[in-house]
Curated annotation (Swiss-Prot):
It comes from Saccharomyces cerevisiae (strain ATCC 204508 / S288c). Pfam families: Cwf_Cwc_15. Residues 53-74, 84-94, 139-149 have a biased composition (Basic and acidic residues). Residues 1-20, 53-159 are annotated as: Disordered. One of its GO terms (molecular function) is RNA binding. GO terms for biological process: mRNA cis splicing, via spliceosome; mRNA splicing, via spliceosome. This is Pre-mRNA-splicing factor CWC15. Involved in pre-mRNA splicing. It comes from the Eukaryota.
Amino acid sequence: MTTSHRPQLEARSGAKAAAYTPTGIEHARLLPGHTTLKYRKFKEEENLRANCAQEDRSNDKSLEEAVMNEEKQDVVGSGNLQETRSEKDQKDSLQELLVTQKNKVEDKAELEGNEQLKGGNSSRRSWRKGTAFGRHKVTKETNIKEHATKKSASGYINDMTKSEYHQEFLHKHVR
């Protein structure tokens, strides 16, 4: 494997001259790593930390319970407020539902109006099924105008530009 993909840390200028000054670039693989050691932690310290964490959690739970008790008292005292809030919430949600339904109907109407996004007629043949020379009949007329007005009756065309398929293609997609 070549080393040409690696950075050039020192220019190769033959023998190290007196004017040689090393660059400040250091390769990442040459830098020292893992210079510190992990020491074992004493189990006593870990137990103290775990106990402190459990006490904090229990304090948080007691605070949450106090807040819940206050809310229950507020709910008992203000039953009518809760009912009006729920009614307002229901009205808001109904309005949002109506707006989203209206938007869906508008989007559907736009999609139906867009002719390019329509599926089209399923009876149309795929463009992949057509061939350039294979299924087209030869016209014996030399006049192209006559060929355009009159359909050929027998044989195959060896010139793609005079084929009926090519004329239809030009009419559909180019003109």
